[in-house]
Amino acid sequence: MTEATTTTDEPATAVTEAATTPNETATAATETATTAGEPAAVDAVAETGDADTTDTAAVRREPYQGIRQTIGEAMAESAHTAPHASHHDTAPAGGLVEARQRLKPRAEDEGVHLTYMPFVMKAVAAVLPEYPAMNAQLDEDAGEILYHDRYHIGVAVATDAGLMVPVVEDVDRKGLLELAAEVNDLVERARNRELTPDELQGSTFTITNFGAIGGEYATPILNYPETGILGLGELRQRPVVEDGEVVAGHTLPLSVSIDHRVVDGAVSAGFCNDLKTYLEDPIHLLL
């Protein structure tokens, strides 16, 4: 749940460092072996093997608690409960790039920074009604599948405290500039840890944008109990074939994960195919 395409970043941090220093006992034994011949060499090997190196390794420990623990437990529940299957595809994005360039001046006049995310959100909201299993959840206790009739999309945001997923409600009923302003506000407040609990609940589908820091494809973990999540790779120019010729063209890698108990592979493939239509030429969003 990862982001030079839209608004979110997916920074990765390393928390463990290792350093080693020579063990004095082993060094002394080795020197003895060098001067005393082969029997001493055998003793040197034994002493080196028995040497305790735990106090020579530097390990930094951090508490596993708070937001990090909450994220970890949610990820584990999702991975261990829902059998994940992923579908990867690439959307032609020349029309998307052009549409954003044409609308950016208007957005700036309104004081709104327009990214690609609102376009993707609108495209997802346009496609989901045709694939209701992607906007659902499984109620195991009741033995029922719940199909949502509203389209509340979570947007994964990387923060210093960990991954947060603020929710934009009723995406299908909002315009691009309204969505852009709302997403920008949620992202900023997520990074400042100013979101309310209500703003992190109620999503029916999630988008994560790992491509903002580079990369193409991944396997997004479901924001359980949702049955679908869309991961975005880096939108950039790549070699594409047009009329038998290799040319440079903007493309957007797509990675979709599903709860395979509810969603069939053919459904996720169809979802991606229709999504590509809207991303290739966003004018279809006006229909």
Predicted region positions:
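C-terminal catalytic/motor cores of large multi-domain enzyme assemblies
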Residues: 2, 6-16, 20-39, 43-287
